[in-house]
Amino acid sequence: MLVPMYTRVLAGTGDYGIVTNLYGWTALLLVLLTYGMETGFFRFINKKEEQEPMRVYASVLYCLLGSSALFSVAVFALLPSISASLGYGDHPEYIGMMAGIVAVDAFCCIPFAYLRYKGKAWRFAGIKLLSIFLNIILNIFFLITCPWLHAHYPEAISWFYRPDYGVGYVFVANVFTTLITLLLLIPDILPGIRAKVDGTVLKQILRYSFPILILGIAGIFNQTADKILFPFLFDDKEYANEQLGIYGACFKIA
């Protein structure tokens, strides 16, 4: 839905190439950071005769919280070198924002799974749809409304808007959407935070989930490898992003 807008309002095809590349990385990292635990959660929480459901929820929730936090700390500690190696040395904040987004999204997959387990279909669908619409609205605001306001009433938005930031606002919109989604899930997260972690159950879930992680990596890498590896095929980073932008837009539309 956002592709036509991106291809129309972003400064050049290279900007959409950046979006395509970073969201390719995000999809792969999301599989790595959930490491099959969503499936493991459903497998064990439904064994009520053997496991206490809330202990299963707490164990998986704390495990994802810990791994997501460690990932975030590692990325931010190595942010300059990671950004430079991926070709974003001039904008390390892109990598920082995407790392935060994927860490929170990985953690939130378990509260969403808990909603499905509890049969709260309306709440599950409502938060998901709100996140989608909010992301669309924020993209329209930053990429269409703000440039218009800057052209006609610059003093109204000069305190927060940078007209030269361009594609960065795609990631800013996603950050806001992710944080609001997390806040909406707090009532569903708290029961798991208050419950006790069962180390024995957690080990069983991890053993069960590991093969799912391997299959997940294989599946998602098959879908995203082209977007991830594309920039490394060219010596000229700017040209690579331009070509990836064209390829990524055609891929989405097709």
What label would you give each PLM region?
Residues 8-15, 118-126, 130-182, 240:
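Membrane-interface helix-loop junctions in multi-pass transport and translocation proteins
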Residues 150-169, 182-223:
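Interhelical loop/hinge segments that connect adjacent transmembrane helices in multipass membrane
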Residues 2, 20-45, 100-110, 216-225, ...:
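Small-residue-rich midsections of specific transmembrane alpha-helices
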Residues 44, 104-128, 189, 193:
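Membrane-interface junctions at transmembrane-helix termini in multi-pass inner-membrane proteins
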Residues 1-15, 83-84, 220-254:
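Helix-terminus/linker motif at the lipid-water interface of multi-pass membrane proteins
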Residues 7, 11-15, 29-63, 83, ...:
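Transmembrane-helix boundary and interhelical linker motifs in polytopic inner-membrane proteins
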Residues 28-29, 65, 69, 73, ...:
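Alpha-helical transmembrane segments of multi-pass membrane proteins
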Residues 3-7, 70-89, 146-158:
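Short membrane-interface helical motifs at transmembrane helix boundaries
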